Amino acid sequence: MEEAKKKIQSLIEKYEQVLNSGKIGDYSEQETKNAFITPLFEALGWDISNKDEVSAEESQKSGGRVDYGFYLNGRLVFYLEAKPLKADLEREDFAKQAIRYSWNKGVDYAVLTDFEGLKVFNSQIIEGALMDRRIFEINYKDYINNFERLWLLSKESFQNGLLDKYADEHSKRLKKIPINEKLDKDIQECRKLLTESFRMWNTKEDIDLIDEGAQKLLDRLVFLRVAEDRGIEPHTLKELSRDLGSQREKNKKDVYQALTSKFRELDDIYNSNLFSEHPFEKWEEHNQSTEEIIEILYGKPGYYDYDFSAIPSDVLGGVYENYLGHRLEKSKKGTAVSKDAKKRKEQGIYYTPTFIVDYIVKNALSPILDKCFISALFCHTFSSCQAA
């Protein structure tokens, strides 16, 4: 800690020289990172040169990127969003940028800094104002005077869970709502809304077919949200909902009908069971439940936004397994359950977590692919020699 203080004191003096020279505005974000932010976290014990410990500029498929991800024993512990010297850290969009990505990734903490100031947020708090999510903030002038607080972002601190303890003591973790819990709750709410709406407007349809149709429509909407955020499909769901909803009296076609027409186009594009024709496409739905569900799948403006390109596949897999559990529980109570769900139950077919997939690929496929690569390289070299 004493060695860290010396290094940070040197950075403070360097910053004040730049400040007094009036050249603060000349520093770009990258120059700020190189000259101040990276050395600051190196002083706090992080190995910036080790990509397994600190990743630089993790990209988001929905656009943009996050500056640094900090890992401990392979586990992501916080994301850091860097800004150029003299940036206005009070701007809410800066903080939300860091918080949004961390929350969707299921990471507890988000850090925002331009070196002059530093803010730490609990990204898992989604209710209340932005200040409710802030765990602490500190100005560069207090980096040494209040070093114990700055040290909460050190590698040693995370090894000992010190930031967790600090957040608990200051009641900054009590309202924590992880992405997996929130998404699962919202998906359940969407399923309930759809099922009730279909039952209301299609009284002659079989109840089990109604449930199946509701899940099929929900599957398609989630797929489209993922495709939108990954840049595979344009952002059409919200625009469709808003455009048709705002002109409801003029339009003979509502959002639900427009979507069912769109599904026929998507079936030609993706040629998969997901978009194959289903009876629900000819059902009635006139209480705007589909519009409400689309809004839910985008998140709650000002509190949290779903970014399906950042949400780990484990989260989506867990949500779907919860649905299968729901279906199987209904079967125990005498309600019919789909053959697909029964098959998964009987044969032990469940979603495989990412870390297990990575382990299997690394230990089963990698050795084989390495041999293939070596063989191909040998053949190429041998052929080149023959040609020569």
Task: List each model region and its residues.
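Extracellular structured ligand-interaction cores
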Residues: 65, 115, 219-221
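Preference for the N-terminal adenyl/adenosyl cofactor-binding alpha/beta module
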Residues: 1-21, 84, 154-388
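Short flexible/disordered coil segments
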Residues: 115-119, 375-378
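A short, conserved, highly charged catalytic patch centered on acidic carboxylates
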Residues: 1-109, 117, 122-152, 158-166, ...
